[in-house]
Amino acid sequence: MLDILRDNPLLLLFIVAGIGYPLGRVRIGGIHLGVAAVLFVGLAFGALDPSLKLPEIVYQFGLALFVYCVGLSSGHGFLRSFRGKGVIYNLLTLGVILLAAALLLIPHYLLSLRPGETAGVFAGLLTSTPALAAAVEYLTRAGAAGQLSDPVVGYSIAYPASVLGVILAIYLAERCFRIDYRAEARTLKDVPGVSPEITCWTLRVCRPKAFGRTVRDLVAEHRLQVVFGRIRRGDHADVVSWETHLEEGDLVTAVGPVEELERAAQVIGCVSEVQADLDRSEVDMREVFVSNPEVAGRTLRELNLPNRFGAVVSRVWRGDLQLLPYADMPLELGDRVRVLSRRERQQEVAAYLGDSYRAISEIDIAVLGLGMALGIGLGLVPIPLPGGITVRLGLAGGPLIVALFLGARQRTGSLVWVLPYSANMLLRQMGLTIFLAAVGTRSGYEFAQMLTQPRGWAILGASAAIIVLLSWVMLYVGYRWLRIPMGLLTGMVAGMQTQSATLGFALDQAGNDLPTVGYAMVYPMAMVVKIVLAPVIIAVLT
């Protein structure tokens, strides 16, 4: 059987994925590994024979595909995150990484580790292959060819312990703080990846200060975060525009979170018992898929639907996430939008947005290939650092940074960079599964061999203890002191660790896309800092 698997890496890949993926759904004591279970199944198979490993190209392909898709979906939120507390979040991550380097001095001296081994444990502890490469390159430049295996050994031991340790820390934090991700998501505002619960109220204009005022003036003056849909004046109904003047007795529908609707009611009058949204005789609503490439990547402000069609977008569904539209929200391929317009213009609006389910099931391979090529190319560019060290962003950093940039831009001319939500999720999951299966089989044998030695167990135990402590410190400080939402924070922990498996677990636990925002927010800084620190550790300890 081993000979068959050795000679057929594709068979090995699908067996590891086929066993690991369903195994990750099994809950033990309320916890499940999710897609991260593929990594541990890969380790088990890799431990059986040194030649039982997937080709390097498989690992590279899965990693590049996964991080590129994560970057595309996080690009818009990544830039928005730095308008608020993004700097604080990155400083927290930086502090934890520096703490990791400091704590490694304990096992370095207690276990008499060589500098290269300590640097390898650092890279494995924070699961950074680029940092491992930087450590190996430093030893090569220093003429220490006989020590090139030291970082690799330390990395192979610490890596699996680190992944499991962080997952354990997240699980303990969820239990300790009694996290309810759904309840948490409902309370969040202006955070990419989640949306508070949205509902529709009918408001009656009965406050004198609102009489004769335009919707634009009232929204700007009171900063109302609601979408006004239709207005009923006497027996006549129409779609609300920015220039609509409100008169006494008007019935206006508004969509938004309950607390914002309460504010809107206080501004213009009161809540009406009449449900004006049920009257569809003149103004109707229709849910439409965004499938027109000419529309994708453009903001609602650019599309200017009220002036073009007399239409208003009142809700946007992206995957399972229901979003409240705002002027600078870019529409993406695969979005499902609820459009209000006069009945005679419904078909016209739908045709403009696309409304083709088949179209959003297709992927522009040319654009996908171009984007990934740009990312892989960036990862190959050598970056000189002080001390004669040259590093590269690699397959993890290059595609992610390019994808963050492209995801923020959404489109360039006729090129639509973002993928339909369903296609992005499919490619992301496939890439992550391939990556985990490959890295598990490639590390399994060395990992098993080191565990036959007491020293290997000591390094493993120290690595596990340090990463659990680091993760717990980050989770506790972030949640208790900085009041960071746990969904965002678990993604930040995965970004600090630059670990796709941890992100997969965090996504499974949260049930929304908030962890990807935290991951993308801190990943670039974390990756660069670890690349710099790995050779510095060797230089300082030599």
From Swiss-Prot:
Cited PROSITE patterns: RCK_C
GO cellular component: a single term: plasma membrane
Cellular localization per UniProt: Cell membrane
Pfam families named in the record: Asp-Al_Ex, TrkA_C
Segments crossing the lipid bilayer: 4-23, 28-47, 57-79, 86-108, 151-173, 365-384, 389-408, 415-437, 457-479, 484-506, 519-541
SUPFAM superfamilies registered for this protein in UniProt: TrkA C-terminal domain-like
Lipid bilayer topology: Multi-pass membrane protein
Record keywords, A-Z: Cell membrane, Membrane, Repeat, Transmembrane, Transmembrane helix, Transport
Entries under InterPro entries matching the protein: AAE_transporter (IPR050144), RCK_C (IPR006037), RCK_C_sf (IPR036721), YidE_YbjL (IPR006512)
Superkingdom as given in the UniProt entry: Bacteria
GO molecular function: monoatomic cation transmembrane transporter activity
Main localization of the protein described in the UniProt heading: membrane
UniProt record, GO biological process: potassium ion transport
Domain annotation RCK C-terminal: ranges: 186-270, 273-356
NCBIfam families to which the protein is assigned, alphabetical: YidE_YbjL_dupl (TIGR01625)
PANTHER family, alphabetized: K(+)_H(+) ANTIPORTER SUBUNIT KHTT (PTHR30445), TRANSPORT PROTEIN YIDE-RELATED (PTHR30445:SF3)
Family, similarity comment: Belongs to the AAE transporter (TC 2.A.81) family.
Annotated protein name in UniProt: Uncharacterized transporter STH2172
Species: Symbiobacterium thermophilum (strain DSM 24528 / JCM 14929 / IAM 14863 / T)
